[in-house]
Swiss-Prot record:
Chain positions recorded as thiamine diphosphate binding sites: 78, 120-122, 151-152, 179, 374
Binding site for Mg(2+): 150, 179
Species in which this protein is naturally found: Chlamydia pneumoniae
Identification of the protein by name: 1-deoxy-D-xylulose-5-phosphate synthase
InterPro entries in the cross-refs: Dxylulose-5-P_synthase (IPR005477), THDP-binding (IPR029061), Transketo_C/PFOR_II (IPR009014), Transketolase-like_Pyr-bd (IPR005475), Transketolase_C (IPR033248), Transketolase_CS (IPR049557)
Keyword Transmembrane: no
UniProt catalytic activity: D-glyceraldehyde 3-phosphate + pyruvate + H(+) = 1-deoxy-D-xylulose 5-phosphate + CO2
């Protein structure tokens, strides 16, 4: 199949065009969609396994229902590439998905009326769907179809919604896309229930045996054997006496082969107009159609550009990539596990992304993956700390939002020394608005007792991790998913213990003070070099700790610096800028301040270069704004690639 040989897909400009195809043509369409996704993601990167697994189900849903009149609500939203291709987005935007000028990797209402919500977090679809369905008058109600993965049922929000379903709610069809995975392998009792009850080989085997036996009964056998759903349910009841979904008021159909579109369509047609809510259980295979993704769906959950070329080049000498901050975290965590025999690690379904597999393998009895349950992860960590054990709660910045009260009530109010390792702090680039880790300092700064810090380099990161085991209060170490600078302006022992609230001066100057957080310290040092061309000498300081703030050092520095710049990859509301500006106001310093941060808006997706330039956080833009703001310009010169 060549890049121009997607004849069926090319015909589809909207779901109405899909309905013009015969059912017999749909398997061929599924293959074309898979080819298109693999071809594009080979160039751009993106979510691969989940999208390959949901192709036939998406085709069947659009074939039976009528979007956007009927409302599709995808949980998480990263598995919507087939949905985008069937709703008029098989264009250049898809060619650049998750990249500059490309489509979002999640549902996005600004792209299409077929996308109802911005998405990115798990467990929200059922609540959103219920809110729409239960408040729309019956006479004007269209179908509402939430599409959830099995991992969503380990999320408390989904169970809360399940508990509120009304049994007389019509035109409400819940799709359970069951691939027995989220990103990493599912965990917990809910996963075990699905595995035992819905996937048990004996269930299908015994069902078929009973049907064959009944068919042999004279006169009534054929009639009895036709009642397959009732028979199937009876068999399932042998393994689970109280069927889960029916106890919550949902009729249940399934499990159904999610890759047999010819069977999916008549089943969806039969449940479409039932006067009560129903759950259709569809079994799919993550990574379907690509052997390496199907064999290792977690590895191919999200792929980088040129992943196919990397696979074919395995025989060549490997170019070892620079270790990222998560890589350093995973390595150091194993060292800490050796040093502290009581150290425990908790994560909400992010063991692979956060590089926790090494610790998990070495210390399985001290590792806990609690599933998509961020609130529980935090409060569970509080319990571990209360029992006298050191504990690190490893969590993405964007997912920590979901556990705000748990951090406040169960950790900070108790003054428990839980260590939050906040991964993916800063811009998320391709993942976009739902995943940017740029808000955590805003709410953590408001928490009494909380220590907040960010490393600029490998060695400082290791120092903070080792030091945090000695702190007696809750702490948050935030770090991005980028290569961790190996060199450091100040050399140091990785085992050096840091005290909270101590900043470091990286370079001395006289004319302007630059305070930069994290790896932006290196950008600040480069800006210092640019300013030297104008005869301007800058002092560069890494605060390291946002809370407690080093009031002593900054009071001393402001006695000799009247011009100050702050630089951070965080929202302008609540981060370094807010902390420093409040410090200046509190102690009544008379200084001219220029803050560089992320503006108070929702940022889209894109490359690092495009995003930082769009908000003026790239080196060239910052240098030129500094020259203008402080009137440092002398003669016309070129700074970087910008004429000033």
């Amino acid at each position: 199949m060549t890049s121009s040989s997607c004849p069926l897909l090319d015909l589809i400009l909207s779901p109405a065009d899909l309905k013009k195809l015969s059912i017999s043509q749909l398997p061929g369409l599924a293959e074309e969609i898979r080819y298109r996704i693999i071809s594009v993601l080979s160039q751009t990167g993106g979510h691969l396994s989940s999208n390959l697994g949901i192709v036939e189900l998406t085709i069947a849903l659009h074939y039976v229902f009528s979007s956007p009149k009927d409302k599709f609500i995808f949980d998480v939203g990263h598995q919507t590439y087939p949905h985008k291709l069937l709703t008029g987005r098989n264009n250049e935007g898809f060619d650049h998905i998750r990249n500059d000028n490309g489509l979002s990797g999640f549902t996005n209402p600004t792209e299409s009326d077929h996308d109802l919500f911005f998405s990115g977090h798990a467990g929200t679809a059922l609540s959103l769907a219920l809110g729409m369905a239960q408040t729309t008058p019956l006479e004007s109600r269209t179908h509402v179809i939430p599409i959830l993965g099995d991992a969503a049922f380990s999320c408390g929000l989904t169970l809360e919604a399940l508990n509120n379903i009304s049994t007389d709610l019509s035109k409400f069809v819940v799709i359970l896309n069951d691939n027995n995975m989220s990103i990493s392998k599912n965990v917990g009792a809910m996963s075990r229930i699905f595995s035992r009850w819905l996937h048990h080989p004996a269930t299908n085997k015994l069902t078929k045996q009973v049907e064959k036996w009944l068919a042999k009964i004279p006169r009534y056998g054929d009639s009895l054997a036709k009642h397959s759903r009732r028979l199937s349910q009876c068999v399932k009841n042998l393994f689970c006496p109280t069927p889960l979904f029916e106890q919550f008021g949902l009729a249940y159909v399934g499990p159904i082969d999610g890759h047999n579109v010819k069977k999916l369509i008549p089943i969806l047609q039969s449940v479409r107009n039932l006067p009560f809510p129903i759950l259709v259980h569809v079994c799919t295979t993550k990574g379907k159609g690509l052997d390496q993704a199907q064999n290792n769906p977690a590895k191919y959950h999200g792929v980088r550009a040129n992943f196919n070329k990397r696979e074919s080049a395995k025989h060549l000498p490997a170019i070892k990539p620079k270790p990222s901050f998560p890589d350093i975290f995973g390595q150091t965590l194993c060292e800490l596990g050796e040093v502290s025999s009581r150290l425990h690690v908790v994560t909400p379904a992010m063991s692979i992304g956060s590089r926790l597999e090494g610790f998990k393998q070495k210390f399985p009895e001290r590792f806990f993956d609690v599933g998509i349950a961020e609130g529980h992860a935090v409060t569970f960590s509080a319990g571990i700390a209360k029992a006298g054990n050191p504990v690190i709660c490893s969590i993405y910045s964007t997912f920590l939002h979901r556990a705000l009260d748990n951090v406040f009530h169960d950790v900070c109010m108790q003054d428990l020394p839980v260590i939050f390792a906040i991964d993916r702090a800063g811009l998320a680039y391709g993942d976009g608005r739902s995943h940017h880790g740029i808000y955590d300092m805003s709410f953590l700064r408001a928490m009494p007792q909380m220590i907040i810090c960010q490393p600029r380099s490998q060695v400082v990161f290791q120092q903070l991790l080792y030091s945090s085991l000695h702190w007696s209060s809750p702490s948050a170490i935030r770090y991005p998913n980028i290569p961790a600078p190996h060199g450091d302006p100040l050399t140091g022992d990785p085992n050096f213990l840091r005290s909270p609230g101590n900043a470091e001066t990286l370079s001395q100057g006289e004319d302007v003070l630059i305070i930069a957080l994290g790896t932006l310290c290196f950008t600040a040092l480069s800006i210092k070099h640019q300013l030297l061309a104008y005869g301007i000498s800058a002092t560069v300081v890494d605060p390291i700790f946002i809370k407690p703030f080093d009031n002593d050092l900054f009071s001393l520095l402001l006695m000799s610096h009247s011009k100050v710049i702050t630089i951070e990859e965080h929202s302008i509301r609540g981060g370094l800028a807010s902390e420093f500006n409040n410090f200046v106001a509190t102690f009544n310093f008379k200084v001219d301040i220029l803050n560089f941060a992320i503006p108070d808006t929702f940022l889209s997706h894109g490359s690092k270069e495009a995003l930082t330039k769009s908000i003026g956080l790239d080196e060239s833009s910052m240098t030129n704004r500094i020259l203008t703001h402080f009137n440092f310009r002398s003669k016309k010169q070129t700074v970087g690639d910008v004429r000033v």
